[in-house]
């Protein structure tokens, strides 16, 4: 009996010239724009070109909009970089939102509780350390359970997002100003205690931090021993064990790093961008 052949088969190309790769991506982008334009016209009756023009104007229409756009891109890129080591290890860390939010919460706690007790430079250092530790703990927990009991990291990290959300909601109610407002407003607005200094403008610091993170992450994954171990574990945990790599240690170490870097972005958001505690899915 002959095995039934599937109608479509997908196989990975060994090599693809850069020019052809760019042509394919450009064609896909063009098709996506055309398709979205058709859907927009059908649903709203508006000219898709005017809709695209409005989108571009909203993102790049003024110098401030350009700065906000690049700042937001930098934050998203930073969070993407944070989960890169885990994904390279094929540990599906879906908890970046919670790890970032717990960094925001740790930073906010330090700014509110220590704002009038220590100097701003010291407060910034304390807030940074607190956020990194909080993110490391948030990354450690699913990694430890995965390493010891082979739990499903996707569900574990996803569920921890909701814990971080509820903790954030709870402390927003505790610290809300004024009572009943459902938000805490700008933290230390009068003293600016714990605020990161502006470099050039309000948008440049996150961009510089993420640019530095990008370079360091490339070096870490491409040229360090840890990066090599992450790659081997990602390809095959059994092969990694045969090679003498302690897989459990690599899993835990990598997720601690991933959680800490997510929390670093939370620190930047709280002490340098929003200057408040919000759910990170809210618009800023």
Descriptions of predicted regions:
Residues 2-78, 121, 126:
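Membrane-interfacial amphipathic/re-entrant helices at transmembrane-helix boundaries
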Residues 9, 13-21, 60-68, 89-92, ...:
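Membrane-helix interfacial "entry" motifs
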Residues 22-27, 69-73, 98-102, 125-129, ...:
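Hydrophobic alpha-helical transmembrane segments
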Residues 25-40, 79-83, 104, 108, ...:
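Hydrophobic core segments of alpha-helical transmembrane domains in multi-pass membrane transport
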Residues 40-44, 50, 54, 59-114, ...:
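Single transmembrane alpha-helix segments in multi-pass membrane proteins
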Residues 153-223, 250:
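Transmembrane helix-bundle core of multi-pass membrane transporters
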Residues 199-274:
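Helix-loop-helix "hairpin" substructures at the membrane interface of multi-pass membrane proteins
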Residues 276-284:
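Residue-level detector of conserved catalytic or cofactor/ligand-binding positions
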């Amino acid at each position: 009996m002959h095995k039934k052949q599937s109608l479509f088969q997908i196989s990975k190309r060994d090599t693809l010239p850069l020019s052809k790769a760019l042509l394919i991506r450009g064609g896909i982008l063009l098709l996506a724009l055309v398709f979205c334009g058709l859907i927009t016209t059908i649903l709203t009756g508006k000219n898709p070109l005017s809709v695209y023009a409005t989108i571009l104007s909203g993102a790049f229409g003024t110098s401030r909009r350009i700065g906000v756009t690049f700042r937001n891109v930098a934050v998203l890129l930073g969070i993407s970089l944070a989960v890169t080591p885990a994904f390279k290890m094929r540990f599906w860390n879906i908890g970046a939102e919670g790890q970032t939010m717990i960094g925001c919460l740790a930073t906010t706690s330090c700014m509110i509780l220590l704002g009038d007790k220590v100097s701003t430079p010291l407060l910034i250092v304390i807030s940074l350390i607190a956020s990194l530790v909080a993110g490391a703990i948030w990354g450690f927990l699913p990694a430890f359970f995965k390493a010891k009991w082979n739990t499903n990291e996707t569900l574990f990290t996803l569920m921890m997002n909701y814990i971080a959300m509820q903790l954030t909601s709870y402390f927003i109610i505790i610290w809300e100003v004024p009572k009943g407002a459902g938000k805490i407003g700008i933290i230390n607005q009068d003293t600016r205690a714990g605020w990161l200094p502006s470099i050039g403008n309000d948008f440049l610091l996150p961009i510089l931090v993420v640019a530095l993170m990008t370079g360091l992450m490339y070096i870490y994954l491409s040229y360090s021993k840890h990066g090599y171990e992450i790659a081997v574990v990602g390809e095959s945990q059994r092969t990694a064990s045969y090679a003498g790599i302690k897989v459990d240690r690599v899993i835990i170490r990598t997720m601690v790093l991933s959680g800490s870097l997510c929390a670093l972005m939370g620190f930047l958001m709280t002490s340098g961008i929003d200057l408040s505690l919000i759910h990170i899915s809210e618009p800023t």
